Amino acid sequence: TFSNKRWLTEEEINSNKEFDNMNSLGFHIPGMFDKVLDINKCWLQDDISNQIRNSVRTYCNQHGYTFFDIRKQEGMMRTLMIRNTSIGELMVIVVFFEDDADKRNQLMQHIADTFPQITSLLYVINQKGNDTITDQEIITYKGADAIYEEMEGLKFKIGPKSFYQTNSEQAYHLYEVARNFANLSGNELVYDLYTGTGTIANFVARNAKKVIGIEYIEEAIDDAKENSQYNNIANTLFYAGDMKDILNQEFINEHGRPNVIITDP
């Protein structure tokens, strides 16, 4: 998150220094919606993510880009999202609040030139009161409109609006545990609730008779269907909509009562 209200540490406050630049790009302080801790290195991310974040922050500060003020709802730079996969694909989404076409294009080109390894470079103009982009237009500046992850020989498409586990390596172990708990014999009807891009649904499909996935975000369901087709999986069905509206008695009468339910906790 970009913010012009940088969170000062206790050490910085006690230093009696004057801080002329309060711009920050990092993570929100718990319980302080308008304060952001400036981050130089996140140890949970690949180093390329740190390089991109630091480069974008430096460029924006040097070229006079305004950082978002959540209270006043003003400023150009809003959020930065970086996603990478185990096969080396890299997605970067820059979210602007105020739009200045010249500055926007200059920044996007700077990112593209500085980090040619980015496989999907996207941007969004989000002038809403909240940071969600699921209802916003995602514009591809350079490269593909999605990235791909691989798991047990399966390939999964991950779009900018699609949820995928942030820790790809651990996600594989999580899915293994879910599959083992399900103890599938090949004859079961499985419901995968809040299926996202259908990664778990497709992951267990080879061990089940049929898998039905339900997800609120329509674009994620499109990815789920594409993932099944790409991996030649024919025993999955996916539906987009609100769970409380879709998963009713009529739905169960049509598709059958599940033997196993996998659900997002």
Spans of features found by a protein language model:
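Rossmann-like S-adenosyl-L-methionine
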Residues: D102-P265
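SAM-dependent transferase fold signal centered on methyltransferase-like domains
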Residues: T1-I139, N180-L189, N253-I262
